[in-house]
Every structure is written in structure tokens, then in C-alpha cells.
């Protein structure tokens, strides 16, 4: 049975881990990094993922970053005349993680646990699941990032404790409060903001640099795409540096030009200035912290430990704000970049039966219900209800002789239906005509362990039933998913062929180089005819390389290898011959030795 990998599919960075020998291990990517940038680029028909894609983002407009922010929406990105959904772009990242996990494990990987922000709604969860399928992964479970972090932290902790997980990622923010004890991880409350993260902290630095430059030079850098990308890189670097030092130098030469020549951006950013610029963002994270405590019916004194997740929690102002709000130092014993993937791998182990005695009780982050008369939102399942769960309620008709009922399914916390997120609509038809208020329509909501919603409506009079698994407006149909799976497989095959071709060209180049070296060494030691054969084979391979015909390169490479082998054989034969001659020469000398007679002379005679 194949291993279940744990994947943290992040806004900025992604990470993959696996359970080996009862311990979760983070799998490094081919560059040796333990996290991979969630960046995809298209260049000359080739797909680049991760660090290589991020490196060329400045010069390549076909580079896609932070696609996770668009999951569950109908947003599409157009690249080289083709439209891609967020699910497809995410699938390219997942495919890359899957491929290097397979290289590490030495076996195919088909099953995964993927994490999502706790505050992701149904559409966003469904989109994540679809992305996994497109990448060729059976998504065994979707789990919340803070819950995964708690799993990674609490696996070896014996005592009962209440922990608050503060997860500030690249594009999303979550807070979850969990109770740990006897292998049970129970989520008591969760709150968050799907549009707040490290990217926003970068943005305040970018805005500051743009306004400074405009003040000094009268040029708006935000209108220049390439300058903006350079600013983004510099802002991210400065933000990271200010976690360790109190000031940093930002230097961007030739960022723009005017009639007098090139212009450079040179400035010093202090930690104090950065804290002033980002104070409103830090304060925004405190709202969900207070909300989660209130929902769980707890005070800050009830929290035993605060776990930090996400690279942005390294910002000193963030840590200071948490300390002020909760009255305790955040726990620093986990790596905020890796802990979520490790937790996902542990959950994979639980599903596969490798990890025993762990029960994970998660909650739904938002209330679910339907629209009723007057546009009111009637909740059936309150937020922070433990999942999986099921809830039914009986409704009736609003008009006399009404034969169909529209079921409008919503997710959110606002009292009016129009202010909440529509998950889907369906109709229950063929209701026998009757005065209003007489028919009995039972609506049932089911939420599975992945947090995905199923709704059904039943006419209790006729037992007629209608049900849907919620497909958001951005949801993909089965045909679309199958088409995307096929395309992803074809692309993976094309990528494999491209790599094979590159390897073949490298081997051919290497062989040409070694042949030239060998020929130089053997000149005068083997016959000119043999050397000529090798030279001709080498020139033929060079010509094939220039034409870029792979089959021809393969043939010519084999021919040159054969010629070089022949040269080596000839060299060894000659060396053996010479050694033989030397030996027989030594034997002849021995035969020509003259035995001399001698006589002893006695001087005493």
C-alpha cells in the first residue's frame, strides 16, 4: 500500500512530509530546500515550478504567485492564449511536490492529506480537493492548518492542555483553540481572515517605497511592472531581515530613469518604521484571537500554550502583540514553516493505521443554512460545530398550492441571506398542491470530515427526495476534472521527455569532451586510422547535436562510445604487447650471460 504524504499547500511556500518509522520527516526538494515557493511560470512552452520560477519572476510576466488567494472563485489566469483555473495552477505545484516525494521514497505516491486554512469555506475546500485529483492524488482528507500544527506539536505530549494556534501565512490568517488530552485533539473554536497574510506586510513596505520615490523623483514606480517586481523582492527581503536586525538597507540601482539619466532607489528602513507601517495589520490579527476565545468560552488565562505557525509569525511586532493579548510568551519549539506539513503526514499515518490512539475532532468554521421567507438566513449548523455532523429541520411552503421549493444553501454569519456566501441552489419539485403551511419539507445538512457539505430536501408527505453535494459556482464538473487530469498527465510526460532530452544532450556533450581528451592522450600511441574513426564519430555527434534530432543524437552517441571503446581496447592491446616484448627481451638477455671460470690465488704460497 502506498504511503500517504502530508502536503501544506501554502500561499507563498509549500511543504511535503511523510511518516517513516513512526516519525514525520520533511522531504527536501531537488534544490535541497525543505520548502518550495508556490510559484508557477510558463516559458517557451515549458512549465517552471518553485525556486526556478520565483527567480525569473522579475523578467517573466507569465509567472503566477499566491494563486491560493483565488481558490474557490471563478478567477482565471490567461497564459500564452490558454486559460487556467486556480485548481490547475495549484495542481502543477502539487504535481511537483508529488514527483520529488516519489524520488525520495522510491515508489509511486497516489494518496495525500492536504491542509487548508481553517477559515476556508466549502468552495475553497472543494477546489483544493479538485487540485489534488488533477495532480493525480487521491485526497484522503482535507484538514485545517492550525489543527495539523497542533497534531505535530501535541503528538508526544502526555498532559491535558488547551492550546491556541496562531497561524499567519503568506495570504491567510487563522486562529484555532484546541484541547489536547489522551490522544484526543478537539478543536473548540476557530476564527480567521482569508485575506490577511505576509503578502500584506510586504505590500505596506512596497507602498512606502513607492511614495518615497515619488516624493523625491516625481515618478510612480507602481505603474512599472518590472520595477514593481523588484520592489516586491526587496520588500520581502527587508521584512525578513528586520526580524533579526533593527534596520536594513534597501538598494535598487537603475530602478527607473528620467531625462537626466538613470535613477536609483537607496534607503534605510528601520524596524520601528516597519512596525508603524504594519501596526494596523498586526491589530487586525487580534480580532480573530478575541473572537476564538469568546466562541470557546475561555479567557486568555485558560490558554496553556500559544503555538506559532507560518513564516510571518517571526515578525517581532506580531510576537509582542500576542504576548500582550494573551499574557504569555509564544512557544518557539516548532518550525513555523514545516509544522503544518508534519501534522498532515501524521494525519496520513492515522488514516493508514500507522499511528494509533489519536482522534482528531475538527469543527466547521462558518455557519450553514438556507434562505427562508423575506430573504432571512436560517442557520441549521452553527459555526464551531464538531465535524462530521448532520442536522435536519422541517420547513413548509410560503404560498398556497406551491408545487416547487427552491433550496438556497448559504454559508456565513450575517442575518440576511444576501450578505452570506451562496454555496448552491437546487429545487424540490412535484409537491402536491396544498394550502401554505401544510406541506412538510425536511432539509438535512451533512458535513463530512473534510468539511465538505451535502444537502438534501425531502417532502415528508410523498417521501420524494432531492439532494446535492455542494458545487460552488467555481466548482469544476467531473468532465472538466477528467480533462485537467489528462492534461496534467500529458504535461508530466512532456516534462519527463524534456528532462530526458536535456540529460541526453548533457551526456553527448560530456562524451565529446572526454573523446577529445582521450584522442590527445593517445596520439602516437595507437594507429592514425583508429584516431580518425573516433574523430569522425565525434564530428557526427556534434552535427546531430546542432540539428537537435534526439534519435540521431542517441545513435551517434552510441557510435562514438563504440569508437572510443575500440581506441581503449587498442591502447590496452598495445600496452600488453609492449609489456610482453619487454618481458621476452629480459629473458633473451638472461640467455646471453657467460659463465666465467675463476681460480683462487693464494698469496701466502
Curated annotation (Swiss-Prot):
Arranged from A to Z, the UniProt key words for this protein are: ATP-binding, Chaperone, Nucleotide-binding, Phosphoprotein, Stress response
- Report a single Gene Ontology molecular function: unfolded protein binding
Induction of the gene: By stress conditions e.g. heat shock.
Question: Which residues carry the post-translational modification Phosphothreonine, per the record?
Answer: 172
* InterPro entries assigned: ATPase_NBD, Chaperone_DnaK, Heat_shock_70_CS, HSP70_C_sf, HSP70_peptide-bd_sf, Hsp_70_fam
Q: Which Pfam families match?
A: HSP70
Give positions of region: Disordered.
579-605
Q: Does the keyword Phosphoprotein apply?
A: yes
Q: Where is the composition biased (Acidic residues)?
A: 594-605
Q: Which NCBIfam families match?
A: PRK00290.1, prok_dnaK
Q: What does this protein do?
A: Acts as a chaperone.
Similarity annotation: Belongs to the heat shock protein 70 family.
Question: What is this protein's record name?
Answer: Chaperone protein DnaK
Q: Which species?
A: Geobacillus thermodenitrificans (strain NG80-2)
Lineage, broadest ranks:
Bacteria, Bacillati, Bacillota, Bacilli, Bacillales
Gene encoding the protein: dnaK
Amino acid at each position: 500500500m502506498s504511503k500517504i504524504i502530508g502536503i501544506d499547500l501554502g500561499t507563498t511556500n509549500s511543504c511535503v512530509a511523510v511518516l517513516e518509522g513512526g516519525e514525520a520527516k520533511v522531504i527536501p526538494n531537488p534544490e535541497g530546500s525543505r520548502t518550495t515557493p508556490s510559484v508557477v511560470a510558463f516559458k517557451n512552452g515549458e512549465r517552471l515550478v518553485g525556486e526556478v520560477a520565483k527567480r525569473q519572476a522579475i523578467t517573466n510576466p507569465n509567472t503566477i504567485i499566491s494563486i491560493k488567494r483565488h481558490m474557490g472563485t471563478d478567477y482565471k489566469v490567461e497564459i500564452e492564449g490558454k486559460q487556467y483555473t486556480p485548481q490547475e495552477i495549484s495542481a502543477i505545484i502539487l504535481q511537483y511536490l508529488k514527483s520529488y516525494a516519489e524520488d525520495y521514497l522510491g515508489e509511486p505516491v497516489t494518496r495525500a492529506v492536504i491542509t487548508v486554512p481553517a477559515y476556508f469555506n466549502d468552495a475553497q475546500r472543494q477546489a483544493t480537493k479538485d487540485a489534488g485529483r488533477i495532480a493525480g492524488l487521491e485526497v484522503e482528507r482535507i484538514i485545517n492548518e492550525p489543527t495539523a500544527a497542533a497534531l505535530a506539536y501535541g503528538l508526544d505530549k502526555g498532559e491535558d492542555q488547551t492550546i491556541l494556534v496562531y497561524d499567519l501565512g503568506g495570504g491567510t490568517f487563522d486562529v484555532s483553540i484546541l484541547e489536547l488530552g489522551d490522544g484526543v485533539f478537539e478543536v473548540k473554536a476557530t476564527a480567521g481572515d482569508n485575506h490577511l497574510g505576509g503578502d500584506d506586510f510586504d505590500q505596506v513596505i512596497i507602498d512606502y517605497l513607492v511614495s518615497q520615490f515619488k516624493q523625491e523623483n516625481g515618478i510612480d514606480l507602481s505603474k512599472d511592472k518590472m520595477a514593481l517586481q523588484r520592489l516586491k523582492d526587496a520588500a520581502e527581503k527587508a521584512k525578513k531581515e528586520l526580524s533579526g536586525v533593527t534596520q536594513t538597507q534597501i538598494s535598487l540601482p537603475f530602478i527607473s530613469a528620467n531625462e537626466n539619466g538613470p535613477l536609483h532607489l537607496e534607503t534605510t528602513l528601520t524596524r520601528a518604521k516597519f512596525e508603524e507601517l504594519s501596526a494596523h495589520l498586526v491589530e487586525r490579527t487580534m480580532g480573530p484571537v478575541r473572537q476564538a476565545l469568546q466562541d470557546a468560552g475561555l479567557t486568555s488565562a485558560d490558554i496553556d500554550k500559544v503555538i506559532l505557525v507560518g513564516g510571518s509569525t517571526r515578525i517581532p511586532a506580531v510576537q509582542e502583540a500576542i504576548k500582550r493579548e494573551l499574557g504569555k510568551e509564544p512557544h518557539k519549539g516548532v518550525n513555523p514553516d514545516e509544522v503544518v506539513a508534519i501534522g498532515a503526514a501524521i494525519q496520513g499515518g492515522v488514516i493508514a493505521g500507522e499511528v494509533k490512539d489519536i482522534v482528531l475532532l475538527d469543527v466547521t468554521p462558518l455557519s450553514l443554512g438556507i434562505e427562508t421567507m423575506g430573504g432571512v438566513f436560517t442557520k441549521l449548523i452553527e459555526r464551531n460545530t464538531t465535524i462530521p455532523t448532520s442536522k435536519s429541520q422541517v420547513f413548509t411552503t410560503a404560498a398556497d398550492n406551491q408545487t416547487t421549493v427552491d433550496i438556497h444553501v448559504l454559508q456565513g454569519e450575517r442575518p440576511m441571506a444576501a450578505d452570506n456566501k451562496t454555496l448552491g441552489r437546487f429545487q424540490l419539485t412535484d409537491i402536491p398542491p396544498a394550502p401554505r403551511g401544510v406541506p412538510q419539507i425536511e432539509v438535512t445538512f451533512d458535513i463530512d470530515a473534510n468539511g465538505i457539505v451535502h444537502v438534501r430536501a425531502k417532502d415528508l408527505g410523498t417521501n420524494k427526495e432531492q439532494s446535492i453535494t455542494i458545487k460552488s459556482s467555481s466548482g469544476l464538473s467531473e468532465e472538466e476534472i477528467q480533462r485537467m487530469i489528462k492534461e496534467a498527465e500529458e504535461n508530466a510526460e512532456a516534462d519527463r521527455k524534456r528532462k530526458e532530452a536535456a540529460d541526453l544532450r548533457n551526456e553527448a556533450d560530456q562524451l565529446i569532451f572526454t573523446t577529445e581528451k582521450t584522442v590527445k592522450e593517445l596520439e602516437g600511441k595507437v594507429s592514425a586510422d583508429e584516431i580518425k574513426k573516433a574523430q569522425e564519430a565525434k564530428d557526427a555527434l556534434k552535427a546531430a547535436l546542432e540539428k537537435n534530432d534526439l534519435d540521431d543524437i542517441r545513435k551517434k552517441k552510441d557510435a562514438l562510445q563504440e569508437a572510443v571503446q575500440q581506441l581503449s581496447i587498442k591502447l590496452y592491446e598495445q600496452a600488453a604487447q609492449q609489456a610482453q616484448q619487454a618481458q621476452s627481451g629480459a629473458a633473451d638477455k638472461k640467455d646471453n650471460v657467460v659463465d666465467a671460470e675463476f681460480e683462487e690465488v693464494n698469496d701466502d704460497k
